[in-house]
Regions:
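Internal helix-turn-beta structural module
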Residues: 304-342
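Active-site-facing alpha/beta catalytic cores
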Residues: 66, 79-244, 265-266, 270, ...
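N- or domain-start disorder-to-order transition segments that initiate the globular core
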Residues: 1-41
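N-terminal beta-rich core of secreted/periplasmic extracellular enzymes
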Residues: 25-38, 42, 72-83, 89, ...
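Conserved phosphate/anionic-ligand binding catalytic regions in large, soluble enzymes, centered on
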Residues: 48-61, 323
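Conserved, mostly hydrophobic/aromatic
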Residues: 52, 261, 327
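Acidic (Asp/Glu)-rich catalytic clusters
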Residues: 40-43, 70-77, 125-130, 213, ...
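Short acidic, Gly/Ser-rich segments with clustered Asp/Glu that frequently serve as metal-coordination loops
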Residues: 54-57, 256, 264-270
């Protein structure tokens, strides 16, 4: 048999009981969820900025980073809603490399899933408590959702997961904003089919139960660029891409058509400084076209305390150990610029 069963994992209920979210923070999350929902549904003209490290590898530096966003959020509260990006699960192109704190709480030690699930939950609770901001994470493993479902205000489904039926069906049971990235091929129809699937009711098996879901009307798309059959990166954040997406949305039987633009990954060719220019181009195009303005509800930006990236083991505080990120000063200025352009 090719599986070796190492540990029986605690259930989500057991982890939640050991590390509960306080009543005060539960109420804060409900308020934040409602604000974000209003943006996705077109009831609130504020703009979403989903910003943070490529991977949330270290609790202290991640929570330090998230807490720095608090003052900026207060300054831009009339124009922007900041959603810290705290990604505890990382997809890997080849399956090798650091897979996130949920799998490997210490990047320099062996994987430990039990400690990883605890570390994931503790980090999210601490980030909310210290910053007053509820966060975004990627749902890489649908069965892990239960460990953080009471903590997250935004969930992303990655380019490699968006075609998977279990991801689509699981999102249909969420009650928070959920972004479906375009697949690495760049196919808009695949992405929109995922939105359609997640917005509708389903009957399936989840964590050992037969379940029914009601559909998630807050499911939308995330444009992250693509990779051609020749291995070249292609972008999909330009004016003509957004107009095409708007036209395709019009033909779909979905509600709340919305898009978030991922400024990194294939849109930047992983040239992290390009995120600044890309963000401003998207904001400019929103000013040029009412259709684009109504469609594009936010940006996704990879940012940390120190710019660039490092190898595991170099121990530079607040510097990414996965994809390179914008540094703090550039990030801070960019958020203020985005707020100014959302007029």
């Amino acid at each position: 048999m090719s599986f070796t069963f190492l540990n029986q994992l605690p259930t989500p209920a057991q982890i939640k009981e050991e590390y509960p979210l306080s009543k005060e923070l539960t109420e804060l999350k409900a308020k934040r969820d409602a604000m974000i929902s209003d943006v996705i549904c077109g009831k609130d003209d504020r703009f979403l900025v989903i910003i943070g490290p490529c991977s949330a590898d270290n609790e202290d530096s991640v929570c330090d980073y998230v807490s720095r966003l608090t003052k900026i959020q207060e300054d831009v509260k009339d124009r922007v809603i900041i959603i810290p990006r705290v990604y505890t699960n990382k997809p890997r192109t080849t399956g090798e490399g650091y897979k996130g704190i949920a799998s490997q709480p210490d990047p320099e030690k062996a994987p430990d899933m039990v400690e990883g699930l605890i570390a994931m939950r503790k980090m999210h609770i601490r980030a909310i408590a210290e910053s007053g901001l509820t966060c975004a994470d990627e749902m890489l493993y649908p069965e892990n959702w239960g460990y953080v479902e009471d903590l997250l205000s935004y969930v992303a489904i990655g380019a490699r997961s968006v075609e998977d039926q279990q991801h689509r069906l699981t999102v249909s049971g969420f009650d928070v904003a959920s972004g479906m990235k375009n697949p690495t091929s760049g196919d808009f129809s695949v992405m929109l089919n995922s939105v359609y699937a997640a917005q509708h009711q389903h009957h399936f098996v989840y964590r050992g139960y037969e379940v029914e879901t009601s559909g998630n009307p807050l499911t939308h798309v995330v444009l992250r660029g693509a990779v051609s059959k020749h291995g070249n990166t292609t972008t999909n954040y330009h004016y003509e891409d957004l107009i095409r997406l708007h036209e395709m949305y019009d033909k779909m039987d979905v509600v709340n058509p919305a898009a978030i633009i991922d400024t990194n990954h294939s849109n930047s060719g992983k040239q992290f400084k390009e995120q600044i220019r890309i963000a401003k181009e998207v904001m400019h195009n929103r000013q040029l076209s009412s259709d684009i303005k109504s469609l594009v509800k936010g940006l996704m930006i990879e940012s940390y305390i120190e710019e660039g990236s490092q190898k595991i083991g170099e121990h530079v505080y607040g510097k990414s150990i996965t994809d390179p990120c914008l540094g703090w000063e550039d990030s801070k200025k960019l958020i203020y610029d985005i707020a100014e352009m959302n007029s």
